[in-house]
C-alpha cells in the first residue's frame, strides 16, 4: 500500500510539472507561407499551355497540389489593387476601402492613388519624394497581419513586386518590409513606413546590375517560334509595340529599349525573373522559414500584366512569358525545397484578375468586341443632366465602372440627388454600349441578375465609389486599347482566376464548385489556426482542410 501511495504521489507531481511547463505537443504550422499572385492570369492559362510547361513549375502545382478550378472574383472592378487586397484580406471593397487602383474622393473630387501616403518618404530610390507609399488607405487587416498578431510579432512578413500596390497591400499594415521597383533608378525601393534605409542585402542586389545580364541578348522566343501554336501569328495589327519598333515582332531589342526607358522591363518576361531573384534575396536576407515562427513571403509577378496589356492574351509574347514564368516558378520551388525543406512550406498561387481578348482579335473572328469612350459618355451625360436640371458639370468622371457625381455642387444647388441618379440611369441604359446602369443604393430592388447584384453590393464604399454603376457589353474596351487589352469588368474572362494550394498539409485534388476570391484568406487562416482578417467575409474552403 505504501508503494502505491508513493507511485501515485510521483505521477501527480509529474502531472503538475507538465502543467507548469506546458504540454510537449506543439501546434503544427509550416515554416513558411508563400502567397503568389500572377498578375492578369486568366484561369485558362493553366491549361492552354499545359502541354508546354515543364514538370517542375505549373505542373508541379497542378499534379501535386489542390486546385480550386472555379474560383471567381466576387466584386467590381477587377483591378490589381482590389484583387490583391481581397486575396490577402478575405474582404471586399465595400469594407476594405480599396475600391480601385485609384478612386475619386466623393467629397473633395480629388483622385487618390490606393497606396499614396504623404506622411512617408521613399527609401533607396532616386528621391525621397518618390516612393511615398504605405498601406494606410487599407481599412482592414490582412492574413499577414493576423499571422504577426498570432505569433506575437515573431513571424516575419515581406512583400515583393515590381508594383508598389501589389507588394504593399498583400504584406499588410504590420509587415517587416515591402519592396517594389522604381523606374527612375532601376532599383527595388521601399518607404519610411517600413524602414529608414535599405538592408545591406537589398543595396547589394540593386548594385549587382542583374537586369543587364537578363536583357543582354534581347527578347527572342524561348523555343522555335513555329512551335507557338496556341497563339496568333507574330505580326498582327492589334498588338502594341515598344517605342522605336517598326512592328510587334520577335526579336525585341530590349537591351536598347531599356537603356532609354527603364519602365520597359515591366512589358517583358525578364521583369518576372528579376522579381524572382529579389524574392530569393529577401528569403535569405530575412532568413525566412528558418526561425521558430511561421514566416510569410508575398510575391506578385507583374510582367504577365504588362505583356498582356501590350500584346493581348492570344499573342506569342504572352505564351512565351508564361513558358518563362514556368521556369521561374520551378526555380523558386527548388530554392524553397533546399532552404526551407520539402514539405515544410505552404504555397498558394492565384491571380488578381484576368483579361479580355483584344478587340481586334474578337472582330477578326466575328466575336463581340468594340471600343468605347468614357469621356464621350461623360460629356453627353452632362449635357442631358444640364437640360433637365439647369446645372452644368454634375458628373465629374466615369471610373472603375462607376459614375462620379459632383455631390457638393448637387447639394449646394438644392437639387434632388435621387432624381439626378434616376435621370442618369435612364440616359445611360439607352446607350448602345451599355447593358445595365443602376443606382447602387437601389440595386437590391433592381432586376439586376445574380451574381452581378452581389458583386455590385460588395463594391460600394460611399466615400470612394461612384453612385451609379455601369455594366458594359461583353468584349468592350476603352478606346485607348486599340492594341493590347485591359480588364475591370464582371465577365468571366476578367474574373475567373486560378487558386492552387501546394505543400505543407495539402493533399492533391480538384474542386469544381464555385469558390470566391474572398475565400482564399480565410482558408489560409484555417490552415494556420489563426484569426481571419478584421474585414473577412469569405468562407473556408473546407475540402482542403486536413481531417483530424
Give a label for each model feature.
Residues 372-415, 486-528, 542-548:
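Substrate-binding rim/cap in mid-to-C-terminal beta-strand-loop elements of soluble/periplasmic
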Residues 20-66:
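Active-site-proximal N-terminal segment of extracellular/periplasmic enzymes that hydrolyze or transfer
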Residues 53, 70, 79, 101-130, ...:
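Secreted, luminal/periplasmic, and some membrane-associated catalytic domains
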Residues 59, 140-149, 400-438, 513-539, ...:
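Non-catalytic, well-ordered alpha-helical segments in soluble enzyme domains
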Amino acid at each position: 500500500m505504501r508503494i502505491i501511495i508513493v507511485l501515485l504521489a510521483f505521477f501527480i507531481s509529474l502531472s503538475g510539472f507538465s502543467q507548469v511547463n506546458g504540454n510537449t505537443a506543439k501546434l503544427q504550422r509550416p515554416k513558411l507561407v508563400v502567397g503568389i499572385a500572377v498578375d492578369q492570369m486568366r484561369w485558362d492559362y493553366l491549361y492552354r499551355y499545359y502541354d508546354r510547361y515543364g514538370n517542375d513549375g505549373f505542373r508541379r502545382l497542378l499534379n501535386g497540389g489542390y486546385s480550386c478550378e472555379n474560383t471567381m472574383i466576387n466584386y467590381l472592378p477587377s483591378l490589381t489593387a482590389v484583387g490583391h487586397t481581397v486575396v490577402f484580406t478575405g474582404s471586399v471593397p465595400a469594407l476594405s476601402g480599396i475600391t480601385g487602383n485609384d478612386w475619386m474622393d466623393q467629397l473633395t473630387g480629388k483622385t487618390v492613388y490606393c497606396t499614396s501616403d504623404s506622411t512617408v518618404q521613399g527609401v533607396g530610390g532616386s528621391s525621397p519624394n518618390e516612393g511615398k507609399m504605405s498601406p494606410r488607405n487599407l481599412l482592414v487587416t490582412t492574413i499577414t497581419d493576423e499571422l504577426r498578431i498570432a505569433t506575437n510579432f515573431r513571424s516575419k512578413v515581406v512583400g515583393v513586386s515590381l508594383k508598389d500596390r501589389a507588394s504593399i497591400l498583400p504584406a499588410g499594415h504590420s509587415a517587416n518590409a515591402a519592396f517594389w521597383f522604381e523606374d527612375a533608378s532601376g532599383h527595388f525601393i521601399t518607404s519610411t513606413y517600413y524602414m529608414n534605409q535599405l538592408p545591406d542585402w537589398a543595396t547589394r542586389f540593386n548594385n549587382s546590375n542583374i537586369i543587364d545580364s537578363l536583357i543582354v541578348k534581347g527578347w527572342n522566343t524561348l523555343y522555335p517560334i513555329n512551335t507557338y501554336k496556341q497563339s496568333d501569328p507574330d505580326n498582327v495589327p492589334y498588338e502594341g509595340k515598344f517605342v522605336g519598333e517598326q512592328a510587334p515582332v520577335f526579336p525585341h531589342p530590349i537591351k536598347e529599349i531599356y537603356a532609354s526607358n527603364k519602365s520597359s522591363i515591366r512589358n517583358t518576361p525578364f521583369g518576372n525573373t528579376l522579381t524572382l531573384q529579389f524574392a530569393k534575396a529577401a528569403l535569405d536576407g530575412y532568413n525566412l522559414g528558418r526561425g521558430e515562427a511561421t514566416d510569410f513571403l508575398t510575391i506578385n509577378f507583374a510582367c504577365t500584366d504588362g505583356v498582356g496589356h501590350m500584346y493581348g492574351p492570344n499573342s506569342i509574347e504572352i505564351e512565351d512569358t508564361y513558358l518563362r514564368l514556368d521556369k521561374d516558378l520551378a526555380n523558386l520551388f527548388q530554392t524553397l525545397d533546399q532552404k526551407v525543406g520539402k514539405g515544410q512550406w505552404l504555397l498558394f498561387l492565384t491571380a488578381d484578375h484576368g483579361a479580355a481578348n483584344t478587340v481586334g482579335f474578337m472582330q477578326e473572328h466575328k466575336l463581340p468586341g468594340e471600343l468605347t469612350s468614357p469621356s464621350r459618355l461623360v460629356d453627353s451625360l452632362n449635357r442631358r443632366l444640364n437640360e433637365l436640371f439647369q446645372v452644368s458639370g454634375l458628373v465629374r468622371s466615369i471610373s472603375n465602372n462607376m459614375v462620379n457625381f459632383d455631390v457638393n455642387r448637387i447639394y449646394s444647388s438644392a437639387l434632388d440627388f435621387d432624381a439626378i441618379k434616376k435621370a442618369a440611369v435612364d440616359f445611360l441604359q439607352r446607350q448602345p454600349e451599355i447593358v445595365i446602369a443602376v443606382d447602387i443604393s437601389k440595386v437590391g430592388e433592381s432586376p439586376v441578375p445574380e451574381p452581378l447584384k452581389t458583386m455590385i453590393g460588395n463594391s460600394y464604399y460611399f466615400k470612394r465609389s461612384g453612385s451609379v454603376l455601369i455594366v458594359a457589353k461583353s468584349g468592350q474596351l476603352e478606346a485607348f486599347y486599340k492594341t493590347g487589352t485591359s480588364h475591370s469588368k464582371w465577365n468571366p474572362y476578367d474574373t475567373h482566376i486560378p487558386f492552387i494550394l501546394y505543400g505543407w498539409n495539402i493533399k492533391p485534388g480538384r474542386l469544381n464548385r464555385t469558390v470566391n476570391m474572398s475565400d482564399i484568406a480565410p482558408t489560409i487562416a484555417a490552415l494556420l489556426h489563426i484569426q481571419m482578417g478584421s474585414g473577412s467575409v469569405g468562407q473556408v474552403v473546407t475540402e482542403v482542410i486536413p481531417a483530424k
